[in-house]
Amino acid sequence: IRILEFSQTTQDSFRSDVEELLSQGAESFIIDLRNNRGGSVDSSLGIANMFIPDGKTLMTTKFKEKSNNKDTVYTSTGYLAVDENVPVVLLVTGGTASASEILTGALRDNDRALVVGSQTFGKGIMQFTIAFMGGYLNITVAHYYTPSGADIHEIGITPDIVVNVDEEYSDEE
């Protein structure tokens, strides 16, 4: 299943795709996050919930405001659409960023996916965007960490199996 971005509707579309594939007898999943720049964190976490049992850590955030200097731990809520024994592979590249890295970290650190591809982008921050003087201003509001506590900002996630993909390859190849 290819996820091009995480929008407000991605989670529902993904759930429908998963349910359809399971009804057709799917025994494993490949989730393609190559060049997915991110988007809705809620959508990313919702998809992680489909694979990770109740109560497991999905990510931890540390907000930058002085009044809220506590870590916030996001845990799975128990909607397990895919059995824990079903193999999952995630495809990633240097263009895999932000919400895509949240999903990648959550599935890998909870032993739910094998990550294949090249080093991800390394956007370990959450930002709020506001319109400002005819343009936009991004304000960093939080830093996030994978379930294992890894800080991926400006580092990325190293795949379990590194496959260097030359930029000249298209999606069709």
Residue ranges and their predicted role:
Residues D12-Q24, D42-N49, V86, E101, ...:
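Solvent-exposed, polar/charged alpha-helical surfaces in well-ordered, non-transmembrane soluble domains
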Residues Q127-I130, L137-S170:
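Conserved P-loop NTPase
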Residues I3-F14, L33, R37-S44, A81, ...:
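Solvent-exposed, acidic/flexible segments
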Residues Q24-F29, D54-L58, N85-P87, D111-L114:
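Loop/turn elements at helix/coil->beta-strand transitions in domains of secreted/extracellular proteins
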Residues I1, I31, F51, V88, ...:
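Terminal peptide-recognition signature
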Residues I1-E27, N49, K70-V73, T77-G78, ...:
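C-terminal, low-ordered peptide segments at domain boundaries
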Residues G39-S98, G124-A131, Y145:
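Gly/Ser/Thr-rich loop/hinge elements
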Residues R2-F6, D32-N36, T61-K64, L91-G95, ...:
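Active-site-proximal beta-strand/loop segments in catalytic clefts of secreted hydrolases
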